[in-house]
Amino acid sequence: MRAARIETCGLPPVVADRPAPVPGPGETLVEVRAAPITPLDLLCATGSSYFGTPTLPYVPGVQGVGTADGRPVWFPTPAGMAAGDGSMAGLASVRAEDLVELPPEADPYAVAALGLSAVAAHMALTWRGELALGEQVLVLGAGGVVGQAAVQLARLAGVRRVVAGARSPAGQERAKRAGADAVVALDTDDVTDLAIRFSAACDGPVDLVLDPSSAPRQRPRPAPCARAAAWSTWAARRPRPARSTPPRCAAARSGCSVTPTTS
């Protein structure tokens, strides 16, 4: 089979023929259809990640989409983080318990591009953030895949307003295309200036903040959130009146489709 192979950390992979993997106990052979190149793949390939130097050579690819026994599946791998090969090959041997079966109509390329990023956005909004109908949401880092997914998922959930923050002009444009009602340029470190921008973009207090940027928790909060929501990486919300059954967002109770954009 053809596979990408990291032979030297810090250098591009080499594409070459390689023997097909032999599944071990509890593993399943997956015919790979799509494999994204994620930031984690790039980090592991440098040899300087927090997982340590990977055993060389190895096939990169920490996640992918393919078919197993005729079923469309999404799958993760430990490539670059532990011994073993990844998804950037014609075939991959994956633990059967790690396979996530997909609907037959799912676009394998869209699912591969979204992957864990869309799951992270969905979980942050719904499980951690308890997003409810009619709320106002602020998404930082909205030009990245997690941020774009969060903007679209929030829209599908029936929020009243989505405000996005992105640093680069390209990221701001991606956030707009994802459906943000307003986009704040994060191109300055002037806290007062940023507070003015957020205040102008937000329609009153923000109910939920999603921050996938892994920034320090002590960073200044946008002014509309200062009185209401404690700051937290990933998701934080302002207190709301107690109610017996909070209205569940549409994205939490039904299937939804989000679209990755990188250009």
Q: Can you annotate each of these PLM segments?
A:
Residues 88, 166-174, 240-246:
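Short, glycine/polar-rich helix-capping loops at beta-to-alpha or helix-loop-helix junctions
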Residues 191-203:
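Short amphipathic alpha-helix with an adjacent loop that forms part of the alpha/beta core around
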Residues 74, 209-210, 232:
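N-terminal Rossmann-like NAD(P) cofactor-binding module of classical short-chain dehydrogenase/reductase
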Residues 141-142, 213, 236:
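NAD(P)H cofactor-binding loop motif with strongest signal on the N-terminal glycine-rich segment
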Residues 111-188:
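Mid-domain Rossmann-like dinucleotide-binding core that forms the NAD(H)/NADP(H) cofactor-binding site
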Residues 159, 216-263:
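Glycine-rich phosphate-binding loop and adjacent beta-alpha segment
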Residues 73-141:
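NAD(P)H dinucleotide-binding glycine-rich loop of Rossmann-like/cofactor-binding domains
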Residues 19-37, 48-82, 86:
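Glycine-rich beta-strand-centered segment in the early N-terminal region that forms part
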